[in-house]
């Protein structure tokens, strides 16, 4: 019975210290101009500020949706005055209905 030869084992060399100064883009060599133009790539994320921005943006979108909904409701109403002088809101009707 012949046994299959064992595959050669490759030794993984530990990474050199000078190769990995820090993970991600902070360790990449770049110019000062690139870092000045793109600071968000090199600054640690600030989670409270991100949460505040997400809540603010969500509230703005909700407010725009609210304004759109109320504008749609107001578009079909007008103020009518009856023969006695009382005013009331009335929905517009088409002449074709």
Swiss-Prot record:
Keywords of this entry: Membrane, Transmembrane, Transmembrane helix
Biased composition, class Basic and acidic residues, residue ranges: 9-20
Membrane topology: Single-pass membrane protein
Pfam families cross-referenced by the UniProt entry: DUF4500
Disulphide linkage map: none
Region of interest (Disordered), residue spans: 1-24
GO cellular component: membrane
InterPro entries the UniProt entry points to: UPF0708
Domain of life: Eukaryota
Compartment(s): Membrane
Spans through the membrane: 48-67
Family: Belongs to the SMIM8 family.
PANTHER family: SMALL INTEGRAL MEMBRANE PROTEIN 8 (PTHR14274:SF1)
Protein name: Small integral membrane protein 8
Taxonomic classification: Eukaryota, Metazoa, Chordata, Craniata, Vertebrata
Name of the gene: SMIM8
